[in-house]
């Protein structure tokens, strides 16, 4: 949710902090600020609104000289969005500045204790308690490191902390518990950040902090300690993303760029994992014996990743002839799930840091289940805590609304199904070879789908003024409709719902009236006739229908409605891989017509790292 960046080195810190914060904007925020230590003095500037306003206010950082600093983009949890509640927060003495992502659960008790000791609070936030409490401990012991140790034993809850002290002009201190934070290693300079995108211009060598760790950064190096203050050797990861992968590259929005990157992203996620016509998952450590002995299979995810899981449920059940349960991570962790030794939990997550998903993973692991994660970010928390990891290799995804991460997750999940199916002997040769053939052809076929962008942009004009849009579909099309509906509502702010077509008569059809926009998905060939009957049904109530079907059924659908989008014919289980692109483009162009902030929709964050 919130974004953190910190720097210690030889360069002007403010310049690096502002650049890092701009690269963290996609995570969502309502205010931003930086604090810099120069000449033994902490200087701070923070403001409600965009980082651009902060940049202007500080004259591109020139008003805050110094080579040590921290920055923050805030997503309000305690206290309304305003200048005072924005981070960083300073201690009463002016010695400490703190940035924080997470929630300090016992902050009210701590605040009352500090007020009794004479501390006066300026904000409504839980974070200011950290600054004041650290100041209190430091005034008692006189040592930054010891004061930090006391602080971490006093606070309860989740936190990623970046802290600087006026008395230590070459020290940046960081701590992590249940909130993501990474370290960046440079030459005569070092960094902290919530996300690698903030650092990619400055370093490719990073390490992810683990829960309970404390890091002390200086120009010369980084020292990391565990909860018992024992030194920890961190594994370095080299980031192979190109700098321009986190730039718009001539596109109006990151979302459009990332939609158009999907053919290449799917090719990267799949091509190296298919050799000689067979799926080869060399990064999977499960033995054939373990695969055949699997008990229950769960897919656990949130948001769009959950919709990938819905598609995966249909496809895995077909390929494995086993029941697969799909669970929302936020529900799974509290549901007392029936999961244990021998069961497989497939965790799907883009960032590898989503709190609910991480908590569900830990709950399943505690009960003895094997964890296989499908994630994008190498070395992320979910990846590190899983028994097996299949990376999607999608590269950085900056727009809040996911596109290429969704597509690559689905591609990897299909490969996993084929691999398991071959080992278990449950997928027939004809289906297996057709799937492999069409997976390799997906990038080219997806490019054909994306070529309909101009047509979709024209259709979007008719939707832009609507208050409600309904999606309907059966089977795989229903799973796909959930994602189409989510994309539309999250970036265009139009109310949208997705319904299983067979449920229309059970209440939904009462919402259909003259002119109601209905997007009918009918790509799944075996159920095309039933899908057509549902189109007729809603048209009889006055619905204005946009249909999405395959090229094979285009003419039949045109007999019922003049607004038809098509996808090439492929093996039916792969149709959602093609069908999602027109829905993404439709949502994008509708939002564009409505003048919405497409890359950073209101009230949304890219990575949800608090409850």
Model-identified regions with their sequence ranges:
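Glycine-rich phosphate-binding loops that contact phosphosugars or nucleotide phosphates
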Residues: 289-441, 521-526, 530-565, 586
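Glycine-rich oxoanion-binding loops at beta->alpha junctions
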Residues: 67, 71-84, 275-289, 312-348, ...
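Conserved short alpha-helical segments that host acidic/polar catalytic motifs at enzyme active sites
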Residues: 1-248, 252-253, 261-296, 334, ...
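Generic C-terminus detector
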Residues: 544, 570-611
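Hydrophobic alpha-helical scaffolding
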Residues: 7-10, 100, 120, 137-141, ...
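Active-site phosphate/pyrophosphate-binding segments
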Residues: 262-266, 270-298, 388-517, 591-611
């Amino acid at each position: 949710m919130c974004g953190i960046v910190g720097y210690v080195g030889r360069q002007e810190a403010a310049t690096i902090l502002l650049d890092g914060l701009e690269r963290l904007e996609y995570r969502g925020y309502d205010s931003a600020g930086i604090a810099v230590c120069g000449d033994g003095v902490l200087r701070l500037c923070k403001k409600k609104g965009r980082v651009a306003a902060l940049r202007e206010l500080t004259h591109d950082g020139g008003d805050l000289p110094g080579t040590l600093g921290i920055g923050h983009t805030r997503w309000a949890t305690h206290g309304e969005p305003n200048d005072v509640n924005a981070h960083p927060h300073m201690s009463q003495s002016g010695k400490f500045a703190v940035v924080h992502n997470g929630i300090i659960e016992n902050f009210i008790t701590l605040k009352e204790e500090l007020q009794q000791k004479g501390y006066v609070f300026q904000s409504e936030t839980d974070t200011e308690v950290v600054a004041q409490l650290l100041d209190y401990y430091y005034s008692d012991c006189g040592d930054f490191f010891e004061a930090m140790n006391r602080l971490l034993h006093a606070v309860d809850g989740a936190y990623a902390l970046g802290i600087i002290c006026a008395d230590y002009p070459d020290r940046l201190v960081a701590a992590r518990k249940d909130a993501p934070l990474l370290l960046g290693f440079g030459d005569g300079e070092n960094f902290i950040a919530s996300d690698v995108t903030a650092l990619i211009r400055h370093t490719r060598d990073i390490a992810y902090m683990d829960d309970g760790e404390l890091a002390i950064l200086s120009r010369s190096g980084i020292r990391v300690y565990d909860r018992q203050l024992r030194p920890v050797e961190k594994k370095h990861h080299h980031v192979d993303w190109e700098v321009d992968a986190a730039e718009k590259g001539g596109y109006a929005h990151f979302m459009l760029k990332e939609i158009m990157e999907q053919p290449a992203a799917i090719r990267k996620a799949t091509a190296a994992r298919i050799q000689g016509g067979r799926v080869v998952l060399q990064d999977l450590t499960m033995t054939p014996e373990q695969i055949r002995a699997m008990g229950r299979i769960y897919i656990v995810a949130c948001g769009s990743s959950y919709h990938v899981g819905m598609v995966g449920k249909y496809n895995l059940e077909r390929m494995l002839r086993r029941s697969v349960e799909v669970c929302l991570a936020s529900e799974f962790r509290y549901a007392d799930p029936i999961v244990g030794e021998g069961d497989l939990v497939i965790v799907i997550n883009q960032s590898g840091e989503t709190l609910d998903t991480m908590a569900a993973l830990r709950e399943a692991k505690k009960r003895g289940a094997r964890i296989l994660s499908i994630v994008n970010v190498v070395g992320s928390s979910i990846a590190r805590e899983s028994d097996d990891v299949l990376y999607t290799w999608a590269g950085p995804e900056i727009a809040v609304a996911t596109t290429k991460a969704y597509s690559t997750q689905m591609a990897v999940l299909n490969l996993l199904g084929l691999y398991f199916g071959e080992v278990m002997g449950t997928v027939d040769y004809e289906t297996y070879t057709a799937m492999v053939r069409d997976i390799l052809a997906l990038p080219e076929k997806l490019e054909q789908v994306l070529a309909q962008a101009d047509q979709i942009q024209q259709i979007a004009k008719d939707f832009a003024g609507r208050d409600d849009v309904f999606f309907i579909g059966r089977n795989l099309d229903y799973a796909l409709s959930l994602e189409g509906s989510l994309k539309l509502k999250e970036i265009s702010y139009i109310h949208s719902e997705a319904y299983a077509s067979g449920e229309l008569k059970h209440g939904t059809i009462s919402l259909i009236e003259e002119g109601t926009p209905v997007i009918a998905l009918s790509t799944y060939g075996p159920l095309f006739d039933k899908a057509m009957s549902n189109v007729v049904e809603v048209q009889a109530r006055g619905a204005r229908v946009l249909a999405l079907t395959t090229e094979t059924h285009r003419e039949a659908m045109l007999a019922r409605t003049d607004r038809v989008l098509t996808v090439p014919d492929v093996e039916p289980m792969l149709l959602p891989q093609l069908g999602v692109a027109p829905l993404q483009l439709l949502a994008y162009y509708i939002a564009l017509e409505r003048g919405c902030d497409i890359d950073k929709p209101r009230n949304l964050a890219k990575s949800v790292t608090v409850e």
